[in-house]
């Protein structure tokens, strides 16, 4: 019989495979920027996706079917998620720092102006504004889902999560179309680099958050969550609100002020 409230995690290959996949992904991405290494990038992405699916499956099994996620374990998971989001905030602070460092004191190499000479920025009141409305609406629907879960309304929570995932997919579709129609590329001065790195990294977070919420949707449909025990969903909702806040900052700083 277990006489302590903590979950003693068993051996798992997924941290190792995820690390290998992330390392290979970085190498493949750098190679892809130089017009080769796409196969390496694809294999690394496949390894990461498989590792995520298997790791997520293990966590769901341990928490839902084996009962390892006690109140103390859940508290640890909460702090872990808070620290993870804090580390993500530091990522985006670095991108904003690079953007403002370049825009507030433009160098002669880019014409001593911002946007740089020859760069035609995107209209902040077209697709970017629509993307903002889409993400804000998704923040409302994920909050609706959370309150429905706490009230024991599983059907309402399921409907709200379906809307949230659809809005996340629509945002990704709009962002991809914006990238294809952009009159500049990632190689067009520091403006193009900071724009595509910052917004692209946010787009990656939208994909991850949409996957997170899709898993929560499947778990909600399968009766995995109760009114008092649904931290898996809470973590996804925290992450999604973080994605919303970052996008508002990106819109105001890069799309609106930066143009």
Curated annotation (Swiss-Prot):
What's this protein's family per the entry? Belongs to the cytochrome c oxidase subunit 3 family.
From the Swiss-Prot or TrEMBL record, state where the protein is found: Mitochondrion inner membrane
Can you state which reaction this protein catalyses?
Answer: 4 Fe(II)-[cytochrome c] + O2 + 8 H(+)(in) = 4 Fe(III)-[cytochrome c] + 2 H2O + 4 H(+)(out)
Q: How does it assemble?
A: Component of the cytochrome c oxidase (complex IV, CIV), a multisubunit enzyme composed of a catalytic core of 3 subunits and several supernumerary subunits. The complex exists as a monomer or a dimer and forms supercomplexes (SCs) in the inner mitochondrial membrane with ubiquinol-cytochrome c oxidoreductase (cytochrome b-c1 complex, complex III, CIII).
User: Which Pfam families does the record associate with it?
Assistant: COX3
Membrane topology category = Multi-pass membrane protein
Where is this protein chiefly located? mitochondrion
Which GO CC annotations does the UniProt entry carry? mitochondrial inner membrane
Which organism encodes this protein?
Answer: Lumbricus terrestris
- Coiled coil residues, start to end: none
The record's GO molecular-function terms, alphabetically, read:
cytochrome-c oxidase activity
| Record carries keyword Nuclease | no
Alphabetic keyword roster: Membrane, Mitochondrion, Mitochondrion inner membrane, Translocase, Transmembrane, Transmembrane helix
List the protein's name.
Cytochrome c oxidase subunit 3
Q: What does this protein do?
A: Component of the cytochrome c oxidase, the last enzyme in the mitochondrial electron transport chain which drives oxidative phosphorylation. The respiratory chain contains 3 multisubunit complexes succinate dehydrogenase (complex II, CII), ubiquinol-cytochrome c oxidoreductase (cytochrome b-c1 complex, complex III, CIII) and cytochrome c oxidase (complex IV, CIV), that cooperate to transfer electrons derived from NADH and succinate to molecular oxygen, creating an electrochemical gradient over the inner membrane that drives transmembrane transport and the ATP synthase.
Does Transmembrane helix appear among the keywords?
A: yes
Q: Which GO terms describe its biological process?
A: mitochondrial electron transport, cytochrome c to oxygen
N-terminal signal peptide = none
């Amino acid at each position: 019989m277990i006489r302590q409230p903590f979950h003693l995690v068993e051996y798992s290959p997924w941290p190792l495979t995820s690390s290998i996949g992330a390392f290979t992904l970085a190498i493949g991405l750098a190679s892809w920027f130089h017009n080769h290494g796409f196969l390496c990038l694809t294999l690394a992405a496949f390894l990461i996706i498989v590792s995520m699916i298997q790791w997520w499956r293990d966590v769901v099994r341990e928490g839902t079917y084996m009962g390892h996620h006690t109140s103390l374990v859940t508290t640890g998971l909460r702090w872990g998620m808070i620290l993870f989001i804090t580390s993500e905030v530091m990522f985006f602070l670095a991108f904003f720092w690079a953007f403002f460092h370049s825009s507030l004191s433009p160098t002669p190499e880019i014409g001593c102006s911002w946007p740089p000479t020859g760069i035609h920025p995107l209209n902040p009141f077209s697709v970017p504004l629509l993307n903002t409305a889409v993400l804000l609406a998704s923040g409302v629907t994920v909050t609706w889902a959370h309150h429905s879960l706490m009230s024991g309304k599983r059907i309402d929570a399921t409907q709200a999560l379906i809307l949230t995932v659809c809005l996340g997919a629509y945002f990704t579709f709009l962002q991809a179309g914006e990238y294809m129609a952009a009159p500049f590329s990632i190689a067009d001065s520091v403006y193009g680099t900071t724009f595509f790195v910052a917004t692209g990294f946010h787009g990656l977070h939208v994909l991850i958050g949409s996957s997170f919420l899709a898993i929560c949707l499947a778990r909600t449909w399968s009766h995995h969550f109760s009114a008092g025990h649904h931290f898996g969903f809470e973590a996804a909702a925290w992450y999604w609100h973080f994605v919303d806040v970052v996008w508002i900052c990106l819109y105001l700083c890069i799309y609106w002020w930066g143009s």
